[in-house]
């Protein structure tokens, strides 16, 4: 059974994917998707907030992807992998109420559901590197 937040992340991923692939406006895509798959008011707010923030910070998120997946140019990643990483990296860095392990697990599950055969392993590796770098940065701040 999928959790309501997992379903919300699936909708965010669908909107990001469609915007990335077809150039459609993410907010218009969300309105259509939420008509097709109604959500609670709380989830709808989460979906819009998360999607809009990811779209706004796409260039910074892509820089993070470049840093932690340096062997893979962002432009050459599959649309799914690229947008799962954008979503998860945003959550890891900016969503303080989402534990890092949860953000990584949710991203891996999205990759298993929507990505290719090696997507989940790739996503997990990149996000583990992001998590480790954040932990190292936090330790340096404490010292």
Curated annotation (Swiss-Prot):
Entry's family note: Belongs to the NusB family.
GO cellular component, one term: cytosol
Keywords: RNA-binding, Transcription, Transcription antitermination, Transcription regulation
Biological role stated in the UniProt entry: Involved in transcription antitermination. Required for transcription of ribosomal RNA (rRNA) genes. Binds specifically to the boxA antiterminator sequence of the ribosomal RNA (rrn) operons.
UniProt keyword annotation of RNA-binding present: yes
NCBIfam families: nusB
SUPFAM superfamilies, sorted: NusB-like (SSF48013)
GO terms for MF: RNA binding
Recorded superkingdom: Bacteria
Entry keyword annotation includes Lipid metabolism: no
GO BP term, pick one: DNA-templated transcription termination
Protein name (Swiss-Prot/TrEMBL): Transcription antitermination protein NusB
């Amino acid at each position: 059974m999928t959790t309501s937040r997992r379903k919300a992340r699936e909708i965010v991923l669908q909107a990001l994917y469609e915007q990335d692939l077809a150039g459609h406006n993410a907010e218009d895509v969300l309105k259509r998707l939420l008509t097709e798959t109604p959500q609670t008011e709380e989830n709808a707010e989460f979906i819009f907030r998360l999607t809009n923030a990811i779209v706004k910070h796409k260039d910074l998120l892509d820089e993070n992807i470049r840093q932690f997946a340096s062997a893979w140019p962002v432009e050459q990643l599959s649309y799914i992998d690229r947008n799962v990483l954008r979503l998860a990296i945003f959550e890891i860095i900016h969503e303080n109420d989402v534990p890092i392990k949860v953000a990584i697990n949710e991203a891996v599950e999205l990759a298993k559901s929507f990505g290719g055969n090696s997507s989940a392993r790739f996503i997990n590796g990149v996000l583990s590197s992001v998590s480790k770098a954040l932990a190292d940065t936090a330790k340096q701040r404490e010292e």
